[in-house]
Amino acid sequence: MLDREGFRPNVGIILINARNEVFWGKRIGEHSWQFPQGGIKYGETPEQAMFRELHEEVGLLPEHVRIVGRTRDWLRYEVPDKFIRREIRGHYRGQKQIWFLLRMVGRDCDIQLRATEHPEFDAWRWSQYWVPLEAVIEFKREVYQLALSELSRFVQRQTRAPLSPYGRGGQHRERDGRDARDSRERSSDQGGRNEQHAQPALTVTTTTVIVETVSVSAPTPSSPNPDDTAPKDNS
């Protein structure tokens, strides 16, 4: 389902834990990480689509989360032609998204990446709030910047502490490289339990943070797809 401009209605999900770290999922069979997201089906509201995608991709139910906020307007990104299937080029341009900020009130063991027969992720971890800005694929970066920035005010309102993307001296932190090198992966058939960190993540500093990555076994697709470029409902 595309709008008149060729954008597919979509929802994005920023899930935070008690330390204001964000859920970060590794796309199945690939080396790319992203937030949960997916298309809005005909007749669905954005909120209904969000809860459906949350269960399909992360295995969580409405009682496991609390809605903290959402973006006021649609945020759009265009997908490069090389990532678009040939038969829909010229019609499909990209995604327009409503982003939701959710607070995790359940436990880490409630996260189940294989809740459906077609999992989206095969590993996950908690990352500092601003890390995804530099870790996500480039053509999504501006939308991530807009969504994280707009929704950060809800996090600050609850914690009464600034949530800045800058470290000491105003220098932007070299986030993704260090976090990726310092992450430790462990396997689990059902998503396992992502052990808690001792460090708070209210601000991004120059301190290297060690994060846990939880992996699950899942079949590798025959051809990796770097983005939700096809007009499918379970992306």
UniProtKB/Swiss-Prot annotation:
Q: Where is the composition biased (Low complexity)?
A: 203-220
Q: Where is this region: Disordered?
A: 161-235
Q: In which residues does the motif Nudix box occur?
A: 38-59
Q: Which Pfam families match?
A: NUDIX
Transmembrane annotation, as ranges: none
Q: Which domain of life is it from?
A: Bacteria
**Ranges for domain Nudix hydrolase:** 6-149
Q: Where is the composition biased (Basic and acidic residues)?
A: 171-196
A GO term, aspect molecular function: pyrophosphatase activity
Q: What is its EC number?
A: 3.6.1.-
Q: Which InterPro entries match?
A: Nudix_hydrolase, NUDIX_hydrolase-like_dom_sf, NUDIX_hydrolase_CS, NUDIX_hydrolase_dom, RppH
Signal peptide feature range:
none
Question: Which cofactors does this gene product need?
Answer: a divalent metal cation
Q: Recite the UniProt keywords alphabetically.
A: Hydrolase
| Family to which this protein belongs | Belongs to the Nudix hydrolase family. RppH subfamily.
Cited function: Accelerates the degradation of transcripts by removing pyrophosphate from the 5'-end of triphosphorylated RNA, leading to a more labile monophosphorylated state that can stimulate subsequent ribonuclease cleavage.
Q: What is this protein called?
A: RNA pyrophosphohydrolase
- Name the lineage: Bacteria, Pseudomonadati, Pseudomonadota, Betaproteobacteria, Burkholderiales
Gene transcribed to yield this protein:
rppH
